């Protein structure tokens, strides 16, 4: 297995019916680079923000040094203009009152309140406005995509790629890794792949890596052998040891940060290769009912790369 510019160019698994000409090549690149000195946040595909943080429920424009009376007057004015915010304002006031009573520290009820408010917002803005969609989803799911993504809180695929409910069957773990077929050691991952391919009949499996990945940094830092200092993490990230070895061989003189970036992409290629060890995945590829794709989300610069497994050679495409 070899790569060019972080993309797998050939795969020759021992147990496969695939032709030796199978290649992984870049098929799509979407960039939205920004000036580092700019105060404007980088944007992604479909002009979505990089960080999809919940919008504040109440957003009055108040001066930092506003007196108590002015703040109360401003709140009353806002509610007189937007009466629909009364319930939400009452909830916020109750939360602030509780925090002040506890000496200004966040209330122990904050997590519950945050989840409650999040669901209310979702139900009002998404669920109740899309009855047809959620009516169909109540009958079952038929996603076209299976996505392997990192557990990192900054890289939720639903936000980054604008996936809608029912559109993608997702597995998230440390460093978005796919282990080789193993009924005993990695049954959880195997069960997800089996269900997605054989029962949901997904048409695409996408493995998405990302910038500044802590799991990949760990892989590049941990010794390859010997005693471990963690219960699970070191053994897990070693799934992609071949990526680490390849990066060190080809980029031995690069800085550690540069090596990590190379490994973030190369680990995706290793996971794509590991998918070929699953019999039902190979069968889907041979029958052309399934496609494998690798992706890389750079949230530092606001860019996304996508490359795919195809038979034979054809011109690369970029946008």
From Swiss-Prot:
EC number: 4.2.1.1
Keywords, alphabetical: Chloroplast, Lyase, Plastid, Transit peptide, Zinc
GO biological processes: carbon utilization
Cellular component terms (Gene Ontology): chloroplast stroma
GO MF terms, alphabetically ordered: carbonate dehydratase activity; zinc ion binding
Record text on subunit structure and interactions: Homohexamer.
Name of the protein described by the UniProt record: Carbonic anhydrase, chloroplastic
């Amino acid at each position: 297995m070899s790569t060019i510019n972080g993309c797998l160019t050939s795969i020759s698994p021992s147990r496969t019916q695939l032709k030796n000409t199978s290649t992984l090549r870049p098929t799509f690149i979407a960039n939205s680079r920004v000036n580092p000195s700019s105060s404007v946040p980088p944007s992604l595909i479909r002009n979505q923000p990089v960080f999809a943080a919940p919008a504040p429920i109440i957003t009055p424009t108040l001066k930092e040094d506003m007196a108590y009376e002015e703040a109360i007057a401003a709140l009353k004015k806002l509610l007189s203009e937007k009466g629909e915010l009364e319930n939400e304002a009452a909830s916020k006031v109750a939360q602030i009152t509780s925090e002040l009573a506890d000496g200004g520290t966040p209330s122990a009820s904050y997590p519950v309140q945050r989840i409650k408010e999040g669901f209310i917002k979702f139900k009002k803005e998404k669920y109740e406005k899309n009855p047809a969609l959620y009516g169909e989803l109540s009958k079952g799911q038929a996603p076209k995509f299976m996505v392997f993504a990192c557990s990192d809180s900054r890289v939720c695929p639903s936000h980054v790629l604008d996936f809608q409910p029912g559109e993608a069957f997702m597995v998230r773990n440390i460093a978005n890794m796919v282990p080789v077929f193993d009924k005993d050691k990695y049954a959880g991952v195997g069960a997800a792949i089996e269900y997605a391919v054989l029962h949901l009949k997904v048409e695409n499996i996408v493995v998405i890596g990302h910038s500044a990945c802590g799991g990949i940094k760990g892989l590049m830092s941990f010794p390859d052998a010997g005693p471990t200092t963690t219960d699970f993490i070191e053994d897990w990230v070693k799934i992609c040891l071949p990526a680490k070895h390849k990066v060190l061989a080809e980029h031995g003189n690069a800085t550690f940060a540069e090596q990590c970036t190379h490994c973030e992409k190369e680990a995706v290629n290793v996971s794509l290769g590991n998918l070929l060890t699953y019999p039902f995945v190979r069968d889907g590829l041979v029958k052309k009912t399934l496609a494998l794709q690798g992706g890389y989300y750079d949230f530092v610069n606001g860019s996304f790369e996508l490359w795919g497994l195809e038979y034979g050679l054809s011109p690369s495409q970029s946008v």
